[in-house]
Amino acid sequence: MDGIKYAVFTDKSIRLLGNNQYTSNVESGSTRTEIKHWVELFFGVKVIAMNSHRLPGKGRRMGPIMGHTMHYRRMIITLQPGYSIPPLRKKRT
């Protein structure tokens, strides 16, 4: 399982870093317990809470045909005080 796809750097996610909360996009088929176990195992941290929501795909037009991009899942991971995750690579657009 790959777990985390990439870190998310928005105004809200940068503000949440002050509360020891990290935001990232994950595989849409993964569950909270899988991601929690993967984060604790890979980074060696203690997770106390996980919030997730699924973001819808955007509409894309190719000539007369209307399509859409895939939806994805975003997790906000809260760590115990004293733990931190090193910065993840930002997705290149």
UniProtKB/Swiss-Prot annotation:
GO terms for cellular component: chloroplast; ribonucleoprotein complex; ribosome. The keyword RNA-binding applies. It comes from the Eukaryota. Keywords: Chloroplast, Plastid, Ribonucleoprotein, Ribosomal protein, RNA-binding, rRNA-binding. It is found in: Plastid, Chloroplast. Its main location: plastid. SUPFAM superfamilies: Ribosomal proteins S24e, L23 and L15e (SSF54189). One of its GO terms (biological process) is translation. GO terms for molecular function: rRNA binding; structural constituent of ribosome. Binds to 23S rRNA. Part of the 50S ribosomal subunit. Belongs to the universal ribosomal protein uL23 family. This is Large ribosomal subunit protein uL23cz/uL23cy.
